[in-house]
Regions:
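C-terminal hydrophobic helical "lid"/dimerization subdomain
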Residues: 1-12, 301-350
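Glycine-rich beta-strand-centered segment in the early N-terminal region that forms part
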Residues: 29-43, 53-97, 102, 152-155
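N-terminal Rossmann-like NAD(P) cofactor-binding module of classical short-chain dehydrogenase/reductase
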Residues: 84, 250-251, 274
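NAD(P)H dinucleotide-binding glycine-rich loop of Rossmann-like/cofactor-binding domains
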Residues: 94-189
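Adenosine-nucleotide cofactor-binding segment
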Residues: 185-196, 200-262
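Glycine-rich phosphate-binding loop and adjacent beta-alpha segment
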Residues: 257-316, 349-350
């Protein structure tokens, strides 16, 4: 059977010269044989989006929607299927073949390079798309089987959209990278979406001590509701004196430079500091180690269904982190995210 794919008119939020979003109608080329055209229903805003506000770019990488078109080589989904979108990988290199797409040899090109693997683009000249293999700040985008996950149609796309990046990173760090065991202890520095996902995952794992550190009392209170056993306000004088030493793990979501010193104070010998910001610090001592993690060492097709299951069970209540905005309000949503007014903004179409 011949599968015919077609170009499609797309309404997309494009970064303008003032680092604001302006909506434009664009003509997107037909999907390649390995691509899937998805009508976007909702998309989370991640802080990574805020770092790529270059003129002419279409951002957005926590998309969720409904399949409209499939290329001739696509077997995982069909038109009408509901999908969550995640990071892109090539599916061809050694790490991908070893079920480590988060270590894909082409990760930077495919997620931050605004291009397909072959260097081409489906977008008009002057417009940069394919961000994280998505560019989901639009009502339609092209993805591949590598960065979509099919879910049941009864699940709310607007609730589950944020799972594909930040939530996956925080929860995956706990469950995949560290493999936290019942009775272990950890501290989470920063209670944004990534940090709170780590808190929820630590509770799922059965951690005995879960310490949330932040300067926002409301977020610390939410962390307690989501499973933290203790909260510490880093704005309070002598807060270091209240910290419990001999922790198994510290997860830094903030990139604040003095964290390595703090980790030395609270980590047990042989403990692990996880940096989720890509920042570097001094070498740790006495058997302690510092590692960085990409996407929570998660294979989205395996891990996102786990998170959906936890959400169904009420153990991963992501909806408590979300503030909704219509796509028309994208600039307000981005500003609120940048100012820390909201934890996880999610854009929705009508």
């Amino acid at each position: 059977m011949t599968i015919r794919t077609q170009p499609r008119k797309v309404n997309a939020a494009v970064v303008n010269s003032h680092q604001q979003m302006s909506f434009h109608d664009l003509q997107l080329k037909a999907p390649h044989q390995n691509e899937v055209g998805v009508r976007i229903v909702a998309c989370g805003i991640c802080h990574t989006d805020l770092g790529f506000l270059s003129e002419g770019s279409i951002l957005g990488h926590e998309g969720a929607g409904i399949v409209e078109q499939v290329g001739s080589a696509v077997t995982a989904v069909k038109p009408g299927d509901h999908v969550l979108l995640s990071y892109q990988s090539c599916g061809q290199c050694a790490p991908c073949h070893e079920s480590q797409p988060f270590n894909c040899e082409h990760f930077a090109k495919l997620n931050f390079g605004f291009q397909r693997l072959d260097g081409s683009s489906a977008y008009p000249e002057g417009v940069q798309g394919h961000f994280f293999g998505q560019s989901a700040f639009a009502n339609y985008c092209l993805v591949t089987e590598q960065n979509l996950v099919k879910i049941a149609p009864e699940f709310p796309l607007e609730v589950l959209a944020p799972l594909g990046c930040g939530m996956q990173t925080g929860a995956g760090t706990v469950l995949n990278t560290l493999k936290v065991k019942a009775g272990e202890s950890l501290m989470v520095m920063g209670t944004g979406a990534v940090g709170l996902a780590a808190v929820m995952a630590a509770k799922i794992a059965g951690a005995k001590t879960i310490i949330a550190v932040d300067r926002d009392p409301a977020r610390l209170a939410l962390a307690i509701r989501l499973g933290a056993t203790e909260s510490i306000n880093s704005d309070e004088e002598n807060y270091l004196a209240t910290l419990c030493p001999h922790l198994d793990y510290v997860i830094d979501t903030t990139g604040i430079g003095h964290l390595d010193e703090l980790a030395q104070e609270v980590l047990k010998e042989g403990g692990t500091l996880v940096r989720l910001t890509g920042s570097c610090g001094e070498t740790l001592t006495r058997g302690r180690k510092a590692i960085s993690v990409v996407q929570g060492d998660s294979v989205a097709q395996d891990f996102l269904p786990r998170l959906v299951d936890y959400w169904q069970q009420g153990r991963f209540p992501v909806e408590q982190l979300i503030t909704y905005y219509h796509f028309d309000d994208i600039n307000r949503a981005l500003k609120d995210a940048q100012n820390g007014k909201v934890i996880k903004p999610v854009l929705v179409w009508d």
